[in-house]
Amino acid sequence: MPWLQVRLAISPEQAETYEDAFLEVGAVSVTFMDAEDQPIFEPELNTTPLWAHTHLLALFEGGTEAAPLLAHLELLTGSPLPEHHSEVIEDQDWERSWMDGFQPMRFGQRLWIVPSWHAAPEPDAVNLLLDPGLAFGTGTHPTTALCLEWLDGQDLKDCNVLDFGCGSGILAIAALLLGAKEAVGTDIDVQALEASRDNAGRNNIADELFPLYLPEELPQVKADVLVANILAGPLVSLAPQLSGLVKSGGRLALSGILAEQGDEVAAAYAQDFDLDPIANRDGWVRITGRRR
């Protein structure tokens, strides 16, 4: 069955208004997409994190006429529509198309991230099985890749690892598969903790090796290795707390940082850590160091 697809160029402030309007006129789905390959910056509390220039993508059942639909939207919102485009698209197996787009990826010398439905390219390598879900972290983003490559290059034997802002659990699970004794994960999002637990089970990691907590429930820990792939603002504001979670001589890896934010984040940790040169990839950076 064909579908009518309508794409609208909006600002974050317009998102809720147009989402409600599209659903009211019969959209079967409404999705927000990055219009210009931009990073998501830290949102205000209790708001949807969106890009400065966002595309709203709405799908309608085949046979829906675009012109009266768009006119109805203008009546509902009380203003002319922003820049928009409509087209009829053919149906496809969306799940299969998505699965085909997620292929095994290698990080460093030992580590592979492998979709759970895909055969491991190197069965004797360290293979982390993963299903992308609601939480961030599949290895495709430069910040995740930078952290995975760093973990692959570390000797993690007998180490306790803390993954602060664990998302899908990919970093903590990678650390465990690479030899860590235990990994603790924490995230503000309950769905992220559920995704971490599911992905740990997929990799035969026992619950006791990977305890998960909301931040307010996190016990007092001292980690041999702390990884935090979140955002620059929280990394700066949480610097005293995160520094205090790392043992003397322990290691730190931070990402989720735009290149222009790197110096500010590094400065927040410089008094407690001997920092390595900043690693850069595609406009994002990783900051690593050792606790004094």
Swiss-Prot record:
Matches recorded under InterPro entries: Ribosomal_L11_MeTrfase_PrmA, Ribosomal_PrmA_MeTrfase, SAM-dependent_MTases_sf
Catalytic activity: L-lysyl-[protein] + 3 S-adenosyl-L-methionine = N(6),N(6),N(6)-trimethyl-L-lysyl-[protein] + 3 S-adenosyl-L-homocysteine + 3 H(+)
Enzyme Commission (EC) number: 2.1.1.-
GO biological process: methylation
Function (record text): Methylates ribosomal protein L11.
Family per record: Belongs to the methyltransferase superfamily. PrmA family.
The name this protein goes by in its record: Ribosomal protein L11 methyltransferase
